[in-house]
Amino acid sequence: MSATLALTEQLIARASVTPDDQHCQQLMIERLAALGFECETIASHGVTNFWAVKRGTAGRAGKLLAFAGHTDVVPTGPLEQWRSPPFVPTHRDGKLYGRGAADMKTSLAGFVVAAEEFVAAHPQHRGSIGFLITSDEEGPATDGTVKVVEALAARGERLDYCIVGEPTSTATLGDVVKNGRRGSMSGELVVKGVQGHIAYPHLAKNPIHLLAPALAELAAEQWDEGNEYFPPTTWQVSNLRAGTGATNVIPGHADLLFNFRFSTASTVEGLQARVHAILDRHGLDYTLNWSVSGLPFLTPRGELSNALDAAIRAETGVSPELSTTGGTSDGRFIARICPQVIEFGPPNASIHKIDEHIDVRFVDPLKNVYRRVLEQLIA
């Protein structure tokens, strides 16, 4: 059994449902410390994080490439639906089954073994290697990567390159890498009316009727046209609530929850201003609370994307596509202290599902891609 596969199995066997790390990080830290990494645990409100760095011969003057990822996994769902226990690594039909196999314990194992092989082959490597690992990516993500980034920023630590081990591939290993993600912003809108008897509408104000024209305009609005890297910004309603449950009462308020997924072609302030303008134009009496869970980030083609492209081609023969689709990731936090952030990992078809798995034939090639990038950028 390869070193990467063995470590993957060890990590899967630890039931690290978010935010409980179950000592996955300690297992990684022990391996990294043996290589000479300086390892620091940064805990916050029950979340376990660590930052590890091995300086190269150039010290802080050299480039720093960090691997970022998460040890936490999503809950298993109904255990009886799994063909094998989710935290017992199981081989079947050339695949390794277990919660976290694809998202993202194989990537974590690949990071560690790639670093081990690289340091053994290049003991005098010029650049530095970092690890930024959290147990709070699948949860609220309020005490995980963002806390490590804040700590690193406070001490003036800057990363030059970062590979996030998210499962970005689709049909085969290496066909898709993510060089950015859209931002996410939600709004909680309450439109005020006047409750009353449904037979006497002149004595009430129906907030649903008042909201409807504005809602139609918001849904039809073209927020931007996107750009070379991002599709157009989208606005979607997630929840609409009103009424008492009775059929003869006009409600006193209507509550609307909505979300923007926005590109670098729009700004938080610009989108908020346009929403308020539409609501004001329709004369609504309302309150609106905003929450921004992530800003968009983008890594244009450059040293990291070129190195990853070359490594994937050499290892798999696949020509990767750069993409910014999908939801948010911890890359949005890391981009604050790192100009080049790219996500790359195994196929994602089974992530978060019953019988999550990875094709065993992809395990070592994934590790080899990570090692090749180290060799190209910091050897």
UniProtKB/Swiss-Prot annotation:
Listed cofactors: Zn(2+); Co(2+)
A GO molecular function assigned to this protein is: succinyl-diaminopimelate desuccinylase activity
- Please name the catalytic residues of this protein: D72, E137
- Per the record, the domain of life is Bacteria
Q: Name one process (GO BP) from the record.
A: diaminopimelate biosynthetic process
Q: Where does Zn(2+) 2 bind?
A: D103, E138, H352
- NCBIfam families in the cross-refs: dapE_proteo (TIGR01246), PRK13009.1 (NF009557)
Q: What is this protein called?
A: Succinyl-diaminopimelate desuccinylase
User: What's the source species for this entry?
Assistant: Burkholderia mallei (strain ATCC 23344)
